[in-house]
Amino acid sequence: MITIRKAEFVTSAVNIKGYPELTGPEIALAGRSNVGKSSLINKFINRRNLARTGNTPGKTQMLNFYRINDQWSFVDLPGYGYAKVSKEIKANWGKMMEEYFSRRENLRAVIQVVDIRHVPSVEDQEMHAFLRNRGIPVLVVATKADKISKGQWGKHLSQIAKALHIPDWHIIITYSAETGLGVPELHEAVEEILSMDNEDS
């Protein structure tokens, strides 16, 4: 487990002009609106309300930067897949993502958060393919596992792997921000990402 000595919100940004100048590796979180990215961050760092959670899908249309241990960063990306917003907002979201993924040099990996209860949406599939095509490492976390019985996990994880074309050897972390399920595994995966950065330096 990673020891979280310090965690703080840095800033929100809508384009590269607002990106903070942070050293060290950066890990982004992507997922549909209300899939639980903020809850995942809060549980990971063991802080209840550092990352703001919301009940309105599509409300947070900014990149939120969080600094961990003064060494590396989480970036909570705006949620996708919301239906009740204008085409202009959707277009702005696409532009925001393209700029971030192409210009953020210290991005090391993306944690893609999906809801274990549902087959990944078209938007989930498009995001996963987009990241893979760019050569960005993707770690899939299937959250809200407490909402279904343990006996159903295997079937649902298989559906997720099939929809996202994830090979059998690639790990999908079963996760619940409510119970803490999967937190040690996520810590281990993040630690591995960070250690790879240390090896390169």
Curated annotation (Swiss-Prot):
SUPFAM superfamilies for this protein: P-loop containing nucleoside triphosphate hydrolases (SSF52540)
Binding site for Mg(2+): S38, T60
Keywords: Cell cycle, Cell division, GTP-binding, Magnesium, Metal-binding, Nucleotide-binding, Septation
Protein's GO biological process: division septum assembly
Taxonomy, superkingdom: Bacteria
Binding site for GTP: 31-38, 58-62, 76-79, 143-146, 175-177
InterPro entries assigned: G_ENGB_dom, GTP-bd, GTP-bd_ribosome_bio_YsxC, P-loop_NTPase
GO cellular component: cytosol
Entry keyword annotation includes Cell cycle: yes
Gene Ontology molecular-function annotations: GTP binding; metal ion binding
Family statement: Belongs to the TRAFAC class TrmE-Era-EngA-EngB-Septin-like GTPase superfamily. EngB GTPase family.
Function field: Necessary for normal cell division and for the maintenance of normal septation.
Protein name listed in UniProt: Probable GTP-binding protein EngB
Annotated source species: Desulfitobacterium hafniense (strain Y51)
Encoding gene per record: engB
